[in-house]
Amino acid sequence: MKEFDLESYDYYLPKELIANYPVLPKEKAKLLVYERRSQKITHTTFEHVLDFFPKNALVVLNDTKVMKARLFGSKHALLPSKTTEVFFHRFFKDNTALTQIKGKIKAGDKIFFDANYHAEVLELLHNGQRLIAFYNHKTPLNQENILKLLEQYGHMPLPPYIKRTDESLDAHEYQSVFAKHIGAVAAPTASLHFSQNTLEKLLKDFKHAFLTLHVGAGTFLGVETKDIREHQIHTEILHIPKKSQEILRESQEVLCIGTTALRSVEYFKRLKNSNQESFECDIFLHLANPIQHVNYLLTNFHLPKSSLLMLVSAMIGLEKTKEIYKIAIEKKYRFYSYGDGMLIL
């Protein structure tokens, strides 16, 4: 069936429609609103986004905060050039970290960030990740100090399709105004559209709940299996506080700000009587595993053959997704992380 064929999720996007910078002010970004019942499409901007939110819906937001996850160092302590890139993925046990390191590397190699700080490669893992430990001279760094190191020396982890180095504006624009709990290596991009003023109005006028899904490096990986149902999606750390869990259980209508919030809600709602607050979320939503517990979605325009495009198709159908993306391209909407948005009602 074509809805399970990976090639069905391919499309052509002119390079000039890939957004390399955000629209400022945020309210001026374009917004495509699609109402499923009437099939109506409205073209507007984000200054009007809350006018379209159903009044009785619970709005769910992901308050993860992006780390400065890209570090550059040298394999030799005395070399001034920092050409070895370390992409921090997540903490592992005993203050070690899972990373991706560009170039040839072997266990025992060291990467120097300055005269004091370095990392040592502990193990090369089968999935391309590298297990490393960070040190200040010979003293291992704990998680708190590793985060300080990232903040001091790291760069914002812009997606690979943004063909430029990070700049000072990315430190705040590639971060939502409600980002709170650090741990993501990519921004939940629908959240980037909210200015402080729009957020305050949302929190005042709508029932809402916060959760934290730390977006992982796997979000940039495309689906590679010919049959999308065979794809194994990456695992991400999810935290839903008890207060938010109670609100989610009580709510009939749910509007999610972004696919990360939607995946989190779907994962949580499918659990049987869990008393936990922290989870390992690995839910892959597509037409064979459709959305059951979320009614509305605010999202960006996603990459061809990506799991996020399949999620959108699970909500509105493959053909309708293709139709709307074709319209968005014709109307010169800007795509991907710094691009424009789409509200599905």
From Swiss-Prot:
One Pfam family in the UniProt entry: Queuosine_synth
Swiss-Prot/TrEMBL keywords: Cytoplasm, Queuosine biosynthesis, S-adenosyl-L-methionine, Transferase
Gene Ontology biological process terms, A to Z: queuosine biosynthetic process; tRNA wobble guanine modification
Enzyme class: transferase
KW ATP-binding (keyword) present: no
Catalytic activity, reaction form: 7-aminomethyl-7-carbaguanosine(34) in tRNA + S-adenosyl-L-methionine = epoxyqueuosine(34) in tRNA + adenine + L-methionine + 2 H(+)
Pathway it works in: tRNA modification; tRNA-queuosine biosynthesis
EC number(s) stated in the UniProt entry for this protein: 2.4.99.17
GO molecular function, one term: S-adenosylmethionine:tRNA ribosyltransferase-isomerase activity
Annotated localization: Cytoplasm
One GO term describing the cellular component: cytoplasm
Domain of life: Bacteria
Subunit structure: Monomer.
Family: Belongs to the QueA family.
Role of this protein: Transfers and isomerizes the ribose moiety from AdoMet to the 7-aminomethyl group of 7-deazaguanine (preQ1-tRNA) to give epoxyqueuosine (oQ-tRNA).
UniProt-recorded name of the protein: S-adenosylmethionine:tRNA ribosyltransferase-isomerase
